[in-house]
């Protein structure tokens, strides 16, 4: 058994020699003999045959070597196939991860850029809206002051009309008293007050009346009284009409201001709400940009890690493939050597005498 193992080890070492199919048995043995292990195995084989050892035992050993090499190759093929499947799965996952990070980077870059553009537009618009609010408030203040001035003017003029109408009514009463026969001396005090009030107004409308009343103070006659009463009635009617016109103007201006102020207030509300919306949007835009920049940095790092992992896996796979191919090639060469030795033993060295003859021819 020990002898068989020794021969097996020597033959296995010899099997690593690389030969070509066109070589003759002499050439094969010559190449084997150049190696120390080859020389030893040839010596053992020669001794084996010289002492009558069976050639079949050597054939069995060579068959065992070939079987071992084929078995090792099958195991290597199986491991290689399993590693290839696992590698392809890892590569597919990494490529998918890389594609995901690349997509995220593009999306985040677009988000950052579009949000930055939107931020710039919002900042410009908020300045415009702020200016519009200031203009709106100024317009409201100016128009409100104008309206207040209009109202104050109406109040003043309406009060003047009331005073004037009261003076006309008082003058009518005095004239009617004179017409009824009351002495002027009894009405003088009232007459002078009315006359003074009418003169204070400095209204052209009252000038004929003032002149008529002045004449009446010096001479009272029925004809003059009738003319004065008619004049008083006309003046009062004009005052009533003028007062009504002023009131109509006041009401129209008040209604217009109510509409205008409502529009200004609505515009102010809209502008304030728009400004608040824009300011809130600006805050959100800045947050979004910051988050996008941070996420972009993270995704870039993740992409670099995934690409590094892919490169490492590809290098590992290339090394494994190279090692597998080298080992496969080595086994194929070893099997070829074993097959050549088997061919020599089977076809050329079937008898001990023939082997010894070839041995002597070679060496």
Curated annotation (Swiss-Prot):
Keywords: Coiled coil, Signal. Belongs to the TMP family. Two components are produced by post-translational processing from the precursor peptide. One of its GO terms (cellular component) is trichocyst. Structural protein that crystallize inside the trichocyst matrix. The keyword Signal applies. Residues 85-119, 244-352 form a coiled coil. The keyword Manganese does not apply. This is Trichocyst matrix protein T4-A. Residues 18-52, 190-221 form a propeptide. It is found in: Trichocyst. Residues 1-17 form the signal peptide. The gene is T4A.
